[in-house]
C-alpha cells in the first residue's frame, strides 16, 4: 500500500503546484467557463430572434407578444447575469437571475420530460451554487478579523449541494458500450465524481475530472467540424457549452476547496 500512497502524495503535490501557480487566474477562468452556456444561449437568442419567437409561438400557441417577451427575458437575463458574474457585481442577484432562466427554459422547452437534459440543468444549478458560495467567501474575507460563528454554514451547504448536483452531469456522460476504453473511462470518471461528492482528495479529483471532461468535450462535441446547415451542429454546440459550464463548476471547486461539509475538512479536525 505504500507505493500507491506515495504515488497519490506525489500527484497531490503536482496538483497543488498547478493550483498555486494559477491561483490568480483560476477563479476568473472558472467563472468564464461557468457562464459560457448562458452567454452562448443569450447570444443565440439575439442572432436567431425571429426563429426563437416563431418556435415559442408554435410550441405553446402563446401569440407573438408573449413569445417576444420570452426571447427578450432570455436574452437580457442571460447576458446581464453573465456580465454581473464576471464583474462580481451583485453576484447573488446575478445567480438568482440565471437560476430563474434555467427553471424557465426547463418548463418552456419541456426539459422536465427529458431525463438527460434535466440532469444537465441540475448540474448547471450546482455550478451556480458554487459561484454564490465563492461570493460569500469573498464577502467574509473583507471582515477576516470579525468573529463569524455559524455564518459559514450556509456557504458550506451550498458547496455540498453544488458538488452533488455537478455529479449529475457526469451521469449523462456514462455510455454503456462494450469497449475496453469506454468501460475504463466510465469507471475512472465515476470514482472521481464520487470522491468529489464526498469531498475526499477533492481538489485533485476535481482537477483530474476537469482534464477528463475537457478531452471528452473536445472529442464528442466538436461542433465546429459540422457544416452550419446541419441540425447536429446546434445540438453539439449546446452540449459543448453546457459541459464547459460544468467544467467551470469543477474549477470553482479546485479554487475554493470542498467546504466544511466534506471528508477533507473532517480529516483536518481528526
Curated annotation (Swiss-Prot):
- Matching InterPro entries: Surf1/Surf4, Surf4
- Membrane topology summary: Multi-pass membrane protein
Q: Which GO terms describe its cellular component?
A: endomembrane system; endoplasmic reticulum; endoplasmic reticulum membrane; endoplasmic reticulum-Golgi intermediate compartment; fusome
Q: Which residues cross the membrane?
A: 65-85, 93-113, 115-135, 178-198, 206-226, 243-263
Tell me, what is an example of a GO biological process annotation in this record? protein transport
Q: Which domain of life is it from?
A: Eukaryota
Name the residue ranges of motif: Di-lysine motif: 267-270
Ordered alphabetically, the record's keywords are: Endoplasmic reticulum, Membrane, Protein transport, Transmembrane, Transmembrane helix, Transport
Q: Does the keyword Endoplasmic reticulum apply?
A: yes
Protein's cellular compartments: Endoplasmic reticulum membrane
Q: What is the purpose of this protein? A: Endoplasmic reticulum cargo receptor that mediates the export of lipoproteins by recruiting cargos into COPII vesicles to facilitate their secretion.
| UniProt comment concerning the protein's domains | The di-lysine motif confers endoplasmic reticulum localization for type I membrane proteins.
Q: Which family does it belong to?
A: Belongs to the SURF4 family.
This protein is called Surfeit locus protein 4 homolog
Name the gene behind this protein. Surf4
Amino acid at each position: 500500500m505504500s507505493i500507491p500512497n506515495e504515488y497519490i502524495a506525489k500527484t497531490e503535490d503536482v496538483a497543488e503546484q498547478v493550483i498555486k501557480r494559477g491561483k490568480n487566474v483560476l477563479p476568473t477562468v472558472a467563472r468564464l467557463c461557468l457562464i459560457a452556456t448562458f452567454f452562448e444561449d443569450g447570444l443565440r437568442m439575439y442572432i436567431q430572434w425571429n426563429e426563437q419567437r416563431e418556435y415559442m409561438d408554435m410550441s405553446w400557441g402563446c401569440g407573438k407578444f408573449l413569445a417576444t417577451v420570452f426571447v427578450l427575458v432570455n436574452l437580457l437575463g442571460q447576458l446581464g447575469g453573465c456580465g454581473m458574474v464576471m464583474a462580481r457585481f451583485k453576484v447573488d442577484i446575478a445567480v438568482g437571475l440565471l437560476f430563474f432562466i434555467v427553471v424557465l427554459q426547463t418548463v418552456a422547452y419541456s426539459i422536465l420530460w427529458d431525463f438527460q437534459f434535466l440532469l444537465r440543468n441540475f448540474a448547471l444549478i450546482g455550478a451556480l451554487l458554487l459561484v454564490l458560495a465563492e461570493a460569500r467567501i469573498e464577502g467574509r474575507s473583507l471582515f477576516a478579523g470579525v468573529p463569524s460563528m455559524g455564518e459559514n454554514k450556509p456557504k458550506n451547504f451550498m458547496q455540498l449541494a453544488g458538488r452533488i448536483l455537478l455529479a449529475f452531469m457526469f451521469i449523462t456522460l456514462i455510455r454503456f458500450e462494450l469497449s475496453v476504453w469506454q468501460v475504463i473511462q466510465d469507471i475512472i470518471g465515476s470514482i472521481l465524481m464520487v470522491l468529489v461528492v464526498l469531498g475526499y482528495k477533492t481538489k485533485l479529483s476535481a482537477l483530474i475530472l476537469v482534464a477528463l471532461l475537457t478531452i471528452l468535450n473536445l472529442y464528442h462535441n466538436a461542433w465546429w467540424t459540422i457544416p452550419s446547415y446541419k441540425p447536429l451542429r446546434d445540438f453539439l454546440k449546446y452540449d459543448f457549452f453546457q459541459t464547459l459550464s460544468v467544467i467551470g463548476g469543477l474549477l470553482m471547486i479546485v479554487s475554493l476547496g470542498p467546504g466544511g461539509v466534506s471528508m477533507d475538512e473532517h480529516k483536518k479536525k481528526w
